[in-house]
Amino acid sequence: MAMTVHCDIVSAEGEIFSGLVEMVVAHGNLGDLGIAPGHAPLITNLKPGPITLTKQGGTQEVFYISGGFLEVQPNMVKVLADTVQRAADLDEAQAQEALKAAENALNLKGADFDYGAAAARLAEAAAQLRTVQQMRKGK
């Protein structure tokens, strides 16, 4: 039987996942992180994108987070995020529309254009599409 670590994924709405996992893969500010049992303690920011949990038995579950924090302790991994969605619940067509709208907004900047907000919308839509694509690969 593979070694496991307890993982909690929590959003502003409440607990989304709680259980034993063999591996957590998340997108941190410095790149992808793979967290396995026995990982060194760590706290880091997370970028918008997929979080992949490899559960006992090797099955994978993919979530989308809008960004947040990852805390690793000897027997626990905790993900704190503003927004969490199961990848299966994401609408790929809607994410593609949001991506196009954000790209158009960046191209049509006017006098009161908020570049930071437009770039954030673009990054979020792109991260949702990456999450959907990653979920498809895992199937």
UniProtKB/Swiss-Prot annotation:
A single GO cellular-component term on record: proton-transporting ATP synthase complex
MF annotations from Gene Ontology: ATP binding; proton-transporting ATP synthase activity, rotational mechanism
Major site of localization recorded for this protein: membrane
Membrane topology of the entry: Peripheral membrane protein
Swiss-Prot/TrEMBL keywords: ATP synthesis, Cell inner membrane, Cell membrane, CF(1), Hydrogen ion transport, Ion transport, Membrane, Transport
Subcellular location: Cell inner membrane
Function: Produces ATP from ADP in the presence of a proton gradient across the membrane.
Similarity comment: Belongs to the ATPase epsilon chain family.
Subunit structure: F-type ATPases have 2 components, CF(1) - the catalytic core - and CF(0) - the membrane proton channel. CF(1) has five subunits: alpha(3), beta(3), gamma(1), delta(1), epsilon(1). CF(0) has three main subunits: a, b and c.
Protein name stated in the entry: ATP synthase epsilon chain
